[in-house]
């Protein structure tokens, strides 16, 4: 941290900060938008220390844009100080996110022609205040420096610079001060009183048609008494008259009856020739060059930094370091050779001065989201796509194997396996237990079967999942028979006995089934499958059999054979139904 006591500052240093008093060719203007802690990690710093409040001010230094330049070298193009900002007092626990800044612009006048390429140095200083400060002290907080390229009269240029823990946002521009004009402020506009053309070596000013443009060197001390309005000089002790004036001091108006340097015939009867178009009309010289008429042609006087017949070639070389943001300069070191900047991928422009919005080119395919990380681009792909630019479509079954007879299914931006019965998981490698969810209600026992699952219902319940209760009186034990099969009303009294016989037959069949299972020997108590070779009764066929019993006059037998039923190992009488399970277990990959 640089710390200087104001009392010890030499007068020469303070005078170096002040604006020069000579008539400037133009003014460089700087606008500070914000200064504060940067976006990096950590707690934001306070510009003041523990000794009390402080306030900020800025110093601007302009130097020629050379490739190697010592920080201590003089500000050859000019320097200036801003006003002091409002007093800032640190508040504990409150981050210094927005610091109070000085009002107005920082102006740096320049005397010579504007170079176009220059070095800009901005210093942020702190003035410590308060009783404990032991006298005001200036401390350098931050310093940013960089090369810039800017033409006089161009729009405001914005920039952001970071140094240490601080971040500075600012704008800058260069403009000519009247009577200077042009991209380099190398030409002057002088007033003329006569409506005729400007004299030799002069041309009308573009922004001021009633004035004449002359080389800036015409500020040379002219002959004593030379009219400042109608005369000018290119060398000391000269006095050249503007058109319409004559005399040694350009104070005598030319008679309207005389003819001046004319090219075309005037109106009939005047005997004079009126001015015609000249080779310098329209300013054929680029980049602020000045045009001079020669016999049948013209010559361009180019400002510093440009050359060529029309000043169209930049005289800046790679030795001047014209490429910004890491650009590679290609060109010879000869002052008469031009240069080309090869920019890194993130920047563009003749001097690599503009950042490229690389995501605007939409490099990510198939709806991927582009992320510009500064040093590289990254694409965030949608489901089903992959690759650096999301160019690979993964919505297919290539290379995807489903085990245990499973089938790969495409769709929805993903792949999945449709598994065979008894298997599940991502690749159908996991065995699936259809009884794991306990599908049998009211205490029914579940058995796995090759065609599905089977529920063995507890006494008093029936149905595919044992969901129906059998009432003791038989009122709603089974669905009613179709209307066409009902007997006459006189036979309805036979229904209760028939239901009683049906219940007895069911109990007898269950007992026979239990005896048959016990006689089968080993393997009968697996609890996971039915006996092979048995016929699975359907929940639909059982009510039909019961209803057929109702059509008889109380007579009828139960099931024809106990071999027609499955026999789980259970001491209770249970009703058994085969439940077709889904043929596949599908799980998304």
From Swiss-Prot:
Q: How does it assemble?
A: Can bind and activate Notch-1 or another Notch receptor.
State what protein this is by name. Answer: Delta-like protein 3
The record, for InterPro entries, names:
EGF-like_Ca-bd_dom (IPR001881), EGF-like_CS (IPR013032), EGF-like_dom (IPR000742), Notch_ligand_N (IPR011651)
- UniProt topological domain (Cytoplasmic) ranges: 516-589
Instruction: Report how it sits in the membrane.
Output: Single-pass type I membrane protein
Main location, first listed in the record: membrane
Q: Which GO terms describe its molecular function?
A: calcium ion binding; Notch binding
Source organism of the structure: Rattus norvegicus
Gene transcribed to yield this protein: Dll3
């Amino acid at each position: 941290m640089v710390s200087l006591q104001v009392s010890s500052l030499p007068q020469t240093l303070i005078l170096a900060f002040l604006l020069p008093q000579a008539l400037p060719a133009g003014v460089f203007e700087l606008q500070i938008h914000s200064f504060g802690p940067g976006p990096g990690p950590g707690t934001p710093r306070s510009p003041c220390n523990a000794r009390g409040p402080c306030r900020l001010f800025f110093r601007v230094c302009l130097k020629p844009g050379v490739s190697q330049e010592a920080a201590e070298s003089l500000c050859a193009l000019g320097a200036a100080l801003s006003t002091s900002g409002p007093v800032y007092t640190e508040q504990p626990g409150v981050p210094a996110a927005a610091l109070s800044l000085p009002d107005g612009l920082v102006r740096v006048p320049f005397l010579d022609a504007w170079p176009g390429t220059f070095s800009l140095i901005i210093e942020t200083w702190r003035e410590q205040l308060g009783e404990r400060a032991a006298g005001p002290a200036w401390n350098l907080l931050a310093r940013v420096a960089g090369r810039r390229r800017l033409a006089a009269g161009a729009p405001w240029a914005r920039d952001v610079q970071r140094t240490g823990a601080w971040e500075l946002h600012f704008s800058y521009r260069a403009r000519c001060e009247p009577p200077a004009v042009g991209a380099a402020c190398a030409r002057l506009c002088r007033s003329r009183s006569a409506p005729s053309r400007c004299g030799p070596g002069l041309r009308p000013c573009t922004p001021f048609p009633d004035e004449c443009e002359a080389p800036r060197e015409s500020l040379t001390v002219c002959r004593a008494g030379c009219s400042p309005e109608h005369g000018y000089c290119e060398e000391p002790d000269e006095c050249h008259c503007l058109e319409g004036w004559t005399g040694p001091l350009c104070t005598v108006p030319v008679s309207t009856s005389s003819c001046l340097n004319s090219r075309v015939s005037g109106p009939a009867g005047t005997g004079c020739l009126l001015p015609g178009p000249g080779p310098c009309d329209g300013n054929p010289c680029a980049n602020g060059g000045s045009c001079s008429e020669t016999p049948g042609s013209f010559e361009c006087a180019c400002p510093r930094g440009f050359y060529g017949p029309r000043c169209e070639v930049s005289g800046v070389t790679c030795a001047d370091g014209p490429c910004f943001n890491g650009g590679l300069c290609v060109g010879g070191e000869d002052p008469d050779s031009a240069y080309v900047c090869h920019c890194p991928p993130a920047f563009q422009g003749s001097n690599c001065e503009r950042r490229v919005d690389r995501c605007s080119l939409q490099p990510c395919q198939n709806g991927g989201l582009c992320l510009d990380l500064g040093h590289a681009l990254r694409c965030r792909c949608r489901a089903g796509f992959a690759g650096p630019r999301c160019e690979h479509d993964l919505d297919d079954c290539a290379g995807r194997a489903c085990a245990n007879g499973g089938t790969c299914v495409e769709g929805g931006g993903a792949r999945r396996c449709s598994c065979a019965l008894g298997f599940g998981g991502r690749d159908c490698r996991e065995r699936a237990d259809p009884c794991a969810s306990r599908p049998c209600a009211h205490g029914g026992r579940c058995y796995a079967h090759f065609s599905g699952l089977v529920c063995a219902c507890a006494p008093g319940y029936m149905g595919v999942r044992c969901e129906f209760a059998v009432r003791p009186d038989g009122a709603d034990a089974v669905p009613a028979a179709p209307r066409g099969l009902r007997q006459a009303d006189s036979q309805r009294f036979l229904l209760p006995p028939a239901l009683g016989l049906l219940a007895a037959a069911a109990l007898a069949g269950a007992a026979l089934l239990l005896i048959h299972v016990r006689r089968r020997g080993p393997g009968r108590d697996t609890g996971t499958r039915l006996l092979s070779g048995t016929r699975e009764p359907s929940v639909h066929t059982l009510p039909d059999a019961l209803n057929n019993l109702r059509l008889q006059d109380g007579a009828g037998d139960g099931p024809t054979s106990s071999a027609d039923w499955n026999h789980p190992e259970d001491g209770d009488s249970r009703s058994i139904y085969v439940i077709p399970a889904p043929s596949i277990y599908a799980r998304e990959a």
